[in-house]
Amino acid sequence: MRKMRIYEYAKEKNLSSKEVIEKLKGLNVHVSNHMSVIDEKTITLLEGNGNQKQGGSGKPEQQKKAGEKKPAQDHGQRKPNTAPAKANNQHDRSQGSDQQKGKAQDGGQKPKHKGNKNKKQHQKNNNNKRNQRGRGRQPEMNKAKPLPEKVTFSGSLTVGELAEKLNKEPSELIKKLMFLGVMATINQELDKDSIELICEDYGVEVEEEVIIDETDIESYVVEDDPSLLKERPPVVTIMGHVDHGKTTLLDSIRNTKVTEGEAGGITQHIGAYQVTVEGKKITFLDTPGHAAFTTMRARGAQVTDITILVVAADDGVMPQTKEAISHAKAAGVPIIVAVNKMDKETANPDRVMQELTEYELVPEAWGGETIFVNVSALTGTGIDELLEMVLLVAEVEELKANPDRLARGTVIEAELDKGRGPVATLLVQSGTLKVGDPIVVGSTFGRVRAMVNDEGRRVKAVGPSTPVEITGLNDVPQAGDQFQAFADEKKARSIGEARATRQKEEERAETSKVSLDDLFNQIQQGEVKEINVIIKADVQGSVEAMRGSLEKIDVEGVKINIIHTGVGAITESDIILAAASNAIVIGFNVRPDGGAKRTAEQEKVDIRLHRVIYNAIEEIEAAMKGMLDPEYEEKIIGQVEVRTTFKVSRIGTIAGSYVTEGKIVRDATVRLIRDGVVIYEGSINALKRFKDDVKEVAQGYECGITLENFNDIKEGDIIEAYVMEEIERT
């Protein structure tokens, strides 16, 4: 039975192997490739199919010519190839035996020559076939690929990368760049302008990809169409000095406006609440105290629209009142002054107005822009007028938001409830939050399971400037965290998990704080256009002198903004304000207390302490100009508290002391601090434990100390020991 490979049959019939394979598929004969073997039956099928097609082709002359040529090819090619392997072996053996017997006849030699001839012919045909195959592919390789409609890139592209995107040879692009006056190599990076010029020359559109960090909630903020914005309630925070009536005022507003007309309504403390005045709502944040206000602002949460500054009419401006003013001004929030306790006989509102003018809060009655309202939180007098003024300021501020979008806002409070799990009070700042919304809150995520408003009622949806308590989060967020609702729960989950992972890695990465050491570099890089400064000094005169000197410093492109001043020790509140405002704290003849030191280390706030005003001014000016000399850093090694004093003739005052922190060393430099103010700075004259002179005394032990040329030591004084260490500027 005759058998042959597909490529042999194709060659015999002057067809391509592909055409033969297609014919076989049409006859339902399965073959894998051109090397597959077909038997005589299949060949008959093929020839029968081919004859039918040829019969209808209308070219008898060509068929006849092909038929005349085929026998010669059959005789030359098929005879050695189609013979079975066994026959060939027998032929070789018989040929070898004939040679051994000496039968070297012409007939015996012919098959050998014929075999060699056929072998050469076969190789020649194979070479022809390879050449034909190569020639067949060549046009496909050289065929030019079409130009793309658009080229996208991020940042920059090399010449080679751009050539690949344009389906062009790099050499072609290099020539174009040469015409543009740019000498480039294949690996040279091209800027945006060069990429756009080349693509424009080819008529291809260019689009720069903007890489968005999906874990950054801020990147999902889309600017709303002004036509979609609607008026929203103002968010109000009440601030002021201790015992000036902040909490009483909050309670008075709540009792007069929340409970009236809502008999049987349950008021639930969720950290914020709403009141309705003349058909309009006002949201109050129930977070009296500057720490909460400032901590949220330090973490990027600007939630307050208006600040009500409460000042007692019988007490006037107090230290925390000044702090509250500084906090509100640093946040850029309008201030309404509520002069409280007007029901008291000793009330003197004119004195309050006079004192507040020193802090640029001038009453409207005196030609200023600050609204003053006389109120009594106890009797309820002036509450309505105060709320009307809040609405007036809100109207001037034009507070608007788009309710028809996915909600976003800020966490006011959060806690872990034993029965309900993580619970968070959110303030929706834009959009509408609905039950069932997937949500990312800080580094947590979840689905809003239930929402309760400030009246304790379950709600299904809340709009802008509305506080609401939600459940359904996987963890407890922190106050000040931003939240964003999503349409897709999978996306919310992936972003929440990515943010949680990043938080673990970075441990809530700190924002870069301004410090004098790195001030010049930050100015050069354009990161700092304004230096916020907090001044604390021992007396008011020093504060004013320091303020005047600092404001005279003139360095091109940078100005000094004094956000807060005060008299006395540097407190934790000062450090919190500095952290929130990215400020430097300058102390003149004062020291930070223990809490302030710890907070400054945690928040990385730069504290500069001086005893000469000129030195402070010179240091800041040099820092702004990038000319700071290598500095000596003060390292506190110990602190002792004076428990009692003894006066001994010829020796002076001996301080009976107790080491509260670190250790006190005989050779260290010390300073004596009284009520946060430095009274003395010098060295130790004698350090004794019982009657023995000692070199040092560790924490938890008592000792006796005398100071060099100083005897005005009193009980309660703090003696601080320190050494100066030289540090390199970075």
From Swiss-Prot:
SUPFAM superfamilies: Initiation factor IF2/eIF5b, domain 3, P-loop containing nucleoside triphosphate hydrolases, Translation proteins
Gene3D superfamilies: 1.10.10.2480, P-loop containing nucleotide triphosphate hydrolases, Translation factors, Translation initiation factor IF- 2, domain 3
Compartment(s) of residence: Cytoplasm
A UniProt-annotated Pfam family: EF-G_D2
Region (G5) residue spans: 376-378
Positions of the UniProt region annotated as G3: 286-289
Keyword Nucleotide-binding part of the UniProt annotation: yes
Basic and acidic residues bias: start-end ranges: 61-77, 89-104, 137-148
Similarity annotation: Belongs to the TRAFAC class translation factor GTPase superfamily. Classic translation factor GTPase family. IF-2 subfamily.
Residues covered by region (G2): 265-269
UniProt biased composition (Basic residues): 110-123
Region described as G4: 340-343
Protein name, entry field: Translation initiation factor IF-2
InterPro entries in alphabetical order: EF-G-like_DII (IPR053905), IF2_II (IPR044145), IF2_N (IPR006847), P-loop_NTPase (IPR027417), Small_GTP-bd (IPR005225), T_Tr_GTP-bd_dom (IPR000795), TF_IF2_bacterial-like (IPR000178), TIF_IF2 (IPR015760)
Region of interest (G1), ranges: 240-247
Organism listed in the record: Halalkalibacterium halodurans (strain ATCC BAA-125 / DSM 18197 / FERM 7344 / JCM 9153 / C-125) (Bacillus halodurans)
Region described as Disordered: 48-151
Main location: cytoplasm
